[in-house]
Structures are given as structure tokens and as C-alpha cells.
Curated annotation (Swiss-Prot):
Disulfide bridges in this chain: none
Keywords, ordered alphabetically: Amino-acid biosynthesis, Aromatic amino acid biosynthesis, Lyase, Tryptophan biosynthesis
Molecular functions (GO terms): tryptophan synthase activity
Pfam families, sorted: Trp_syntA (PF00290)
Subunit structure: Tetramer of two alpha and two beta chains.
Entry protein name: Tryptophan synthase alpha chain
The enzyme's E.C. designation: 4.2.1.20
Swiss-Prot/TrEMBL catalytic activity: (1S,2R)-1-C-(indol-3-yl)glycerol 3-phosphate + L-serine = D-glyceraldehyde 3-phosphate + L-tryptophan + H2O
Family as reported in the entry's similarity comment: Belongs to the TrpA family.
Gene expressing this chain: trpA
Parts of the chain that traverse the membrane: none
Recorded metabolic or biological pathway in which this protein acts: Amino-acid biosynthesis; L-tryptophan biosynthesis; L-tryptophan from chorismate: step 5/5
GO annotations of cellular component type: cytosol
Active site: 50 (proton acceptor), 61 (proton acceptor)
Amino acid sequence: MTNRYTTLFANLEKRNEGAFIPFVTIGDPNKALSFEIIDTLVSSGADALELGIPFSDPLADGPTIQEANIRALESGITPKDCFDILTKIRAKYPHIPIGLLLYANLVYANGIENFYQKCLDAGVDSILIADVPAHESKEFRDIAKKVGIAQIFIAPPDASESTLKQISELGSGYTYLLSRVGVTGTETAANMPVEDVLTKLREYNAPKPVLGFGISKPEQVQQAIKAGAAGAISGSATVKIIQNNISNKQKMLNELTYFVKEMKAATLN
């Protein structure tokens, strides 16, 4: 099992910082530019990456990320291209944790063990399967353990204590804490209070909780860290910058740089 997450969180804790983790879809808007985008996110200060593999029916995603999936698929991106990009990123950045956020069908289509092995070979540290809750995850979990990849679970804000306990016991890497129920996107802003859930996760010794869903502003990152989260994930807001600058690559990369720097600065206590 890679220990990049453990190392990252320990280093951030020493420096009294939280993690800023941007999400983008691999291959959006095309293979060549996708590598440059991910490269820009890391060089601008992202602490870890959360990446999607394009899928035709992303159920948990709002319109922004659905459109990113469509752009990537229409550009002709294949799963092999996605693994090529991951391998290049890992070669350039040996220490950054890389997580994949995807759907069960994509994993099944490749055979679970084969897919996890490919991910490991490409330098992936963790896999979160958005449509598989912890209590249905045994076949994925067992293979993740065997292959040496962290299986990430989502903790919804309305989760029962027994669900939170299960997530804490079964998960590794980090815990993806939802700031609210619903689909992803900055269309609906993140609403705290997640303090109670964070307290429970700490009590159950869960992998470090990172807050996601609707995180688009530095002050939301600050609030998340103040509430006790180890970091924040921002997907739709990052992807919107790509969407809004499709025809102007330099402006897109400049805006992504500014956005990551600003969000990362908000994690400093």
C-alpha cells in the first residue's frame, strides 16, 4: 500500500495546513491539454489530485462535471489514454497522492482486479467508487487491499452513527466528507455544519476527513479546516474554469493557477 496520503497529512499537520485537492476529468477537453491542466494544478500548489475517468452516465455529478465528461468523450479519449496521462503525471510528480473518483460500471467493464492493478501500475493511490456505499463494497475492498490501493468512502452529512463507524473501519487513505446531500456542483453552495460528523469520525479514528461538494471559494476552505476537516476538494469550480476558457488555453491555465493558489492559501492556519 502506498503511504503518500499518510505522508501528506503528517507533513501538512506539522506545518499547520490543510490539504487543497482539485478535481478534474481526465481528457477534458482533450488528451494533450488535459495533461497540461493537471500539470498546472500540481505546479500551482495542489496537495493531492482527485481525477475522474470519463463516463457516459455520471450519476452523482451536477451539470458542470457531466459536461466535462461529454467534452472528454467527444474528443475521443479512451481509458488507455487516461492511464497514459496518469503515468506521465506520476513520473513527473513522484510524491503527490493521486485519487480516482469513478463509477462501478467502469470498474466492472475492465474486471475489478485488472482495473485496480492498472491503476496501481499508473501510480494511482486511491479509488473512490461514487455509486458503491461502504456496506456494498466488499468485492472492491478486498481487491483494493490485495493490490495495495486505498479504498475511499463517502461520509454523507446525514449518515447514521453505525454508517460512520463502518466507513471509519473500512476506509483508508482519507474519508470523503460530503458537505451536503445531492449532486456535485457549485450550483448549490456547501453548507456546514459538519462539525458533528467530524467529531464522530475522529472518535472512530477514521482516515483523515476531506470536505467536498460545492466548495468554490477560499472562505469555504477556511471554514472546512476550522471545523476540523483535514482539507477540501473542489471539483465543479475547477472544471468551470476549463469550461469558461475552452477557446483560450493561456487564459484557462492562468485562471487555474490563480484559483489553486488562492484556495491553497486558505488552508494555511
